């Protein structure tokens, strides 16, 4: 299988040989951390809880730049840190958080191909030990609104036969899982 951007993927074997360190942080992104991270996670991984940490409960939008900076600082991440994301539900929420990182200008970012599920299927080890994290001072970029499509943008593009799903400026991607 080939990927459009293989440079943003790391595999489980590579990660097992290249653990987190001061310049490389591993973050598990879970929708359900009680049945994920808290039962066991890859050694050195910190947690971003999708529902609590990334979404503003009032505006139902992603967190603000200031909140993102605080979350990164709490996780010991700087703007130069290599961040590897993985998570439950086939990396759905890790991919969402990847996008949020990109919104705020973080460039050195990867996703562990296969997520928790692949790590588990390979019978790799988990720990329940919390990593020791030294807080950092994260400085993000202003949000890149070019990476977002609002309702108006989507509505404007739907139904235009000359565009199909993609145009020069936009592409709509169906990210629902296949039915097995």
Listing of model-derived features with the role each one plays in the protein:
Residues 2-79, 155-180:
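Positively charged, proline/Ser/Thr-rich regional signature most characteristic
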Residues 56, 62-160, 177-180:
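Thiolate-centered catalytic microenvironments shared by cysteine-dependent enzyme domains
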């Amino acid at each position: 299988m080939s990927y459009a951007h293989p440079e943003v993927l790391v595999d489980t074997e590579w990660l097992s040989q290249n653990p987190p360190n001061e310049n490389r942080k591993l973050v598990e992104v879970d929708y359900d951390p009680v049945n994920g991270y808290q039962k066991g996670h890859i050694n050195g991984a910190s947690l971003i809880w999708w529902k609590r940490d990334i979404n503003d409960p009032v505006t139902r939008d992603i967190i603000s730049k200031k909140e993102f900076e605080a979350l990164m600082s709490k996780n010991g991440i700087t703007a130069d840190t290599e961040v590897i994301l993985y998570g439950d539900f086939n990396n759905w929420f890790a991919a969402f958080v990847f996008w949020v990182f990109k919104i705020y200008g973080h460039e050195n970012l990867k996703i562990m191909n296969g997520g928790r599920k692949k790590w588990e299927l390979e019978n790799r080890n988990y720990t329940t030990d919390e990593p020791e994290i030294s807080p950092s001072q994260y400085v993000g970029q202003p949000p890149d609104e070019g990476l977002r499509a609002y309702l108006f943008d989507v509505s404007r593009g739907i139904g235009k036969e000359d565009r199909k799903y993609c145009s020069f400026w936009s592409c709509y991607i169906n990210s629902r899982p296949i039915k097995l």
